[in-house]
Amino acid sequence: MEQLVSGAATEQMINMLKNVADAVSMEKLNDNLIRNFSMNRLLGFLTILDTEKILMHIEEAMKQYEFLTGRKLKNSTKINLFIHVGCLTERLIRNSAIEDYPEKDKFQKIHKKEIRQIQAAFSVIEKTYSVKIPISEIGYIYDI
């Protein structure tokens, strides 16, 4: 299970299921596995957000990010984003965002394109929960 979640056994899973499931079904199975694993981890952290709903919105944001950047996120990255963005959203609702980020000004100058992509992809979180993701939090999303 650990190897499936980390992505290490994804190729093995594809080989085992290739005769009974198409690529879209296997992708959906992988996404559900990652989502359920993340939900179990998030349940212990979130107190005011509906875990199922926030996961749905984060998943939407990640798909938009993959579309905008043209790159597929690894399973481990998805899990980290589910947990980080879930907790981040709750922090923002409580007005306790992390404001510090190492060399924030330098980050803003060097990574303008990436910042715009993250802002566009995660705008669903901002709109749904009426929050604004600060540049410091965007930096931490970028690091993931």
State what each model feature region is.
Residues 1-144:
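A cross-family "folded-core" feature that marks the main globular domain of proteins
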